[in-house]
Amino acid sequence: MAQVNIRRDVEDQFYRYKMEVLQGKVEGKGNGIKTVIVNLPNIARDLDRQPEYITKFFEIEFNAKSNIENEKYSINGQYTVERLASALDKFISKFVLCSFCKNPETKFVIKKGVIEFKCAACGRVGPIDMKHKLTSYIVKNPPKAVSTKSTHDEALAQQPQIKKEKKSKKKKDDDDEEDDVVWFTDTSEKAAEERKKKAIGDSTSAVISMMADISVEPQSAKEEQDEDDEQEEGQEKESDPVSSISSFLETNPADQELMEKLDSVQEEFGLRSSATSKAAIEALCKNAENTIKFVKTQTALLKKISKRRDGKLGILLGFEELCVKDETLLKSIQGILKNLFDAGILTEENILKWYHQKAKSKVVIKACKDFIAWLETAEEEEEDEEEDEEDDS
């Protein structure tokens, strides 16, 4: 089944959170026409939400009655797949994504009629908008808790009976085997001597075998495990563009070598040009201290990255992603943008277009609003000056 990013606004093909592509099917005629969401149970599983919540959200969104019958979910009326997908995006935004980190790893916690998000990705707990009509339905129909206590108790209760049956079966098998064999012992002096020699030989062999097992096997097993770990570690390092670039940076390459590496990474992972530059920024800036230092000292390298196709957009998206992952950088985002602007790496047009059209993180947008206001004011003043000069001439 084809899959799509849970956040459809994220174009990164390596985005880890996926769900099935929504499938709709129109049934009936006239007043009885309805649209069936064929794979809603699978989508609900991918989102870790009750399918009834999604159906109810569609009912509210389209102002149409929903129907649930034998795990078949439908909405009265005829709707295109794109319209259903857009409504699903709204549901995901309001009732799945964490309001802090924007990852879909949340669960509902209902306390005294108030629903809160608990995010497994960032650990934050926060309330959701209780004004939406769906919240009252969720409170009345809370998520089903999966309890393992009953199944555990049943298993414990069955253990004595299972053990008893095993013992009974083993005893029966032993009795059957004994019935089929006739045992006798040669009591002659020669036979007794041979049995004695064989017993001594078997004991010696067993001791030697045990010593060999103790001294050799753990060492070879350990070496084998170490080799496996090294192979797995190497595979993980190259599993995504950022890791691939980070590994290459450990060789201290020249700027031109890094540019060539970015070209090969783009081809290897099938990235857009802006996504490649974004990955480069993420790899080059590993923490808040390095990020600020990097912006101030690596102007030449940043200019080279900016000259790549869509490189300026990639730089902005990269710093946005860094701020989303590390909130300590949020207080420095305006200074970072100012340095990039003053150094001629980014222009007013680049920054304003990113801010108004491409930026996705509300936290980052809010954090740099003062700088954007200053930039827009400066742009207006510059336009006024140009108009005055034209009037004078």
From Swiss-Prot:
Residues of the region (Disordered) are 144-179, 217-247
Q: Which UniProt keywords apply?
A: GTP-binding, Initiation factor, Nucleotide-binding, Protein biosynthesis
Q: Which residues form the W2 domain?
A: 223-385
A biological process term (GO) from this entry: formation of cytoplasmic translation initiation complex
- What are the annotated GO cellular component locations? cytosol
Q: What Pfam families does the record point to?
A: eIF-5_eIF-2B (PF01873), W2 (PF02020)
The record lists GTP as bound by G28, K29, G30, N31, G32, I33, K34, T35
Biased composition (Acidic residues) is annotated at 224-233
Query: Can you tell which superkingdom this protein's organism belongs to?
Result: Eukaryota
> Does the entry feature the keyword Protein biosynthesis, yes or no?
yes
- So what does this one do? Catalyzes the hydrolysis of GTP bound to the 40S ribosomal initiation complex (40S.mRNA.Met-tRNA[F].eIF-2.GTP) with the subsequent joining of a 60S ribosomal subunit resulting in the release of eIF-2 and the guanine nucleotide. The subsequent joining of a 60S ribosomal subunit results in the formation of a functional 80S initiation complex (80S.mRNA.Met-tRNA[F]).
The similarity comment for this entry is: Belongs to the eIF-2-beta/eIF-5 family.
- Protein name as annotated: Eukaryotic translation initiation factor 5
- Gene transcribed to yield this protein: eif5
